[in-house]
Amino acid sequence: MNAGNDPLFIVDDFEVEELPENMDMIESITVLKDASATAIWGSRAANGVIVITTKKGKANDFKISYSNNFKVSAKPNFDDLHRANSEQIIDYDREAHLYGYNSMMGGFGYEGSGYSLSQEILNDYWEDVIIDWETGAVSPMDPQKLAEMDARLNKLKAYSNRKQIEDYLLRNAFRQQHMISVSGGTDRVNYFLSGSFIGGHSEYVGDQERSYNINSRISYKLLHNLTLRSDLSATFDNNDNGYTNLSNDIYNLFPFQMLVDEAGNRIADYTQFSRMDADKYTQEYGYLSFGKNLLDEIDMANNTTKNTDYKARFGLDYRVIEGLNLSADYQYERYQSINKDIQSINSYGVRELINQHTVIGENGLSYRIPKGDILDHSQTDVEAWTMKIGATLNRNFGADKQHYVNATAGFEARSKHTTTESYRKLGYNDQTLSWSPIDAIDLATNGTTPPWSSNPMRYYASSYDKFSDILNREISYYLSAVYTYDNRYTVSGSLRIDKSNLFGVSDKYRRNPIWSFGANWNIKNEKFFKCDAISALMLRASLGLTGNFDRSGRTSPIMVGQFISSDLVDGGGYMRITTPPNPLLRWERTRSINLSVDLGLFDRINTTLTYYHNKGYDLLGEAQLDPTVGYSEQLINSADMNNSGVEVQLDADLIRTRDFTWNVGWVFGYNENKIIRNSAHDSSPVLNRVHGTTRFVEGYSREGIWSYRWAGLNEMGLPQAYKADGTKVTTYEDLTVEDLEYSGTYQPKYSGSLSTGFRYKNLQANFLFTYNFGHVFRVEYPDMNPFGSSPALNERIADRWRQPGDEAKTDVPAICSDMMNYLMTYQTGASELAQYSSNSIRKGDMIRLREILLNYDLPKKWLRNSPVKRLSITAQLNNVWLWTANKEGYDPEAVSPVSGTFSLTDPIAFTCGVKLDF
């Protein structure tokens, strides 16, 4: 569960972390799910295996091919975030101000804390709202002052930065791919040579991607029974990352915060101070500017990443006798990634850091962080090798060749050595490659107290200087065999033993045996079966055991620590424990049973029905510990889970003539899982369940969502929840796990796709629909914190409770008008009750038109007098249409299902391309 649930990718018989970026390199893709098919691939096969075969050269088939595609995506639609507009946020701040919250705090913010333009206006009037501290009563503002304040606020309401964001910060994402290949061969040599380029940019202004790849695949027939294979590739990436915080900063812009004024001059956003406070420190004392403008940040960004990836693979195939082959393969990979981020002294982040550690002395300002640029440098190096030695027997025997045997045995060893280093240089000069030293110990222990703060600000230089060295080694032994009699009865079996150094020195925990057994019955080939309408009929069954483990380093049988080179007290070194020891760490294991029926009708319809049941045990989960032992939580083997379902796959040629075909493909899946054991202790089960941090609740789905039972708003506009006995409470602190409601699972129970394709002569059209049903998700509620609004406020604040009686027509809580009540009760879980209530749950059912694809092959007669043998033109649309069951039309795939946070949906995208064969 926590060891990962991604499938295993196998490319040309070797395990890889990612799929090839250029799909034109791929010859075929096969998905393996049943136990007999996946057990042979080892520990990560518990989540399924995707086997990819890339293109090779063919004898006497010389070919030059070129392909390209260009993809353009629409700009992001920020309406998907459902943020409040300027008027809604300002009205919200104004109401909180009139209730006295601003006055109670002496202003929405304090010097150096940061506040918005609307709060900056309201801060000018905080003394005009008088609070009776004995009764909590708030006096109304003087009408003249109120009118003056409203006039300033109304002017601000008219501003909206949406168009400026779209014009200056966003663009249509673009990506292009080009590939050229030469392939062919003779009776002794086959070759496939290719080169490709990928370039483009994201939807955010400032970044740029460039990637180059060359590949050589050659096989040499050294002897009549001995073949040498080589596969060499190199990839070079050179990327400009731009201003990497741009998307996050856009999210955090208040809608009335403009980027430029009417004359086109850039406007600074004073996120730390009001303009008045900022001017005081810059003009009177000489501090660096406290303003920030995203256009400036984009212009100053100097953040690059360079990646190189070299792979060399060599293999030998030796045919001992007819049907018996030996093979040996070795792959070596060297990968390096270097990131260099030079942050200008004029960028906001550098100015902020320098200002925080600048003190006013008798002789002016003293800079404890040197004035200059900052260099953040990181480098990752990976050296990996894989060796495989195996034997394969593939024979038919018997008088009528009725017996068929395919057996494979082999050995595999893998090693992956990863080193990383990162460091920061302050006062950096890229021209002279120089930097300035700092008093790191004093900055970390004593820090600096700037004049706008009563607390010291500390700078931990050691947190930027990191080094790591990780070595993973795995060894595997495997054996598999398939026997078929008369093309009717088949039995198969496999055994694999995996060992990993991640489990310490004890062979008891290092070794992971994996096995499978399967049987097939091809009924169609039985002599008694006489039905011409049924073109295929086969029964299949398999069972097996697979395993998985956490490769991320979050758990270990031995203690893992990080050496800190400088102690803050005496300057010496010390060891920080990063992973506590888990001497009982074991592999995650999965027992699988698969039953399938393959049915073909009239040589036009093919369908497969599969039932599977998987039992996972010793699954890794977060266990909360007694803090007195030194750790609050640890990843341990703590849970068992059942996972079962049904899959149906149908392909049908409804119409099939020489010039016209119409085919339909349908995939349907039903899946449900249930935790059947959990030995981990949960010290805060109520909050952890509703927040989704507790996944192992016995008797329920791993992806279950828990909620407070919604009881509506009370007469003061406060959210309420039901206890199990029906009583109402206004704070989660009065609730236990028995009071919670199980809302369902965010993992779809029913999912699949429907595809249909038409071909008329050389023109093809395909449509792909995907669907998900039987799941739920949570939607975002406004955070009703009256002490200053956030740019991420949900637009539903406009529907909040405002007066008695509103509780009958809205479910959005009020800004509590009684400060005393707020301080005593409302702030303790008021927004929590609403956000994580059953009222925030929506159905996740959806149908999406994922893809429309058109392809046209030029008739060969048009190319008869040209060197081009084939020319194909493709056009494709993605993310075309969406239907959802929830009434608001929220895209379930663009919402965090547990927290309800909205994200941007995938925009519609258009792709076109050309393929040519010479």
Feature-to-residue mapping (PLM):
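Low-complexity intrinsically disordered tracts that form flexible linkers/tails across taxa
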Residues: 239-260, 678-682, 885
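Outer-membrane beta-barrel transmembrane strand signature
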Residues: 121, 126-183, 188-194, 267-319, ...
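Extracytoplasmic gating/loop element in the C-terminal half of outer-membrane beta-barrel translocons
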Residues: 295, 349-353, 358-360, 772-872
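Short, small/polar-rich motifs associated with maturation and membrane association
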Residues: 1-215, 220-222, 227-229, 235, ...
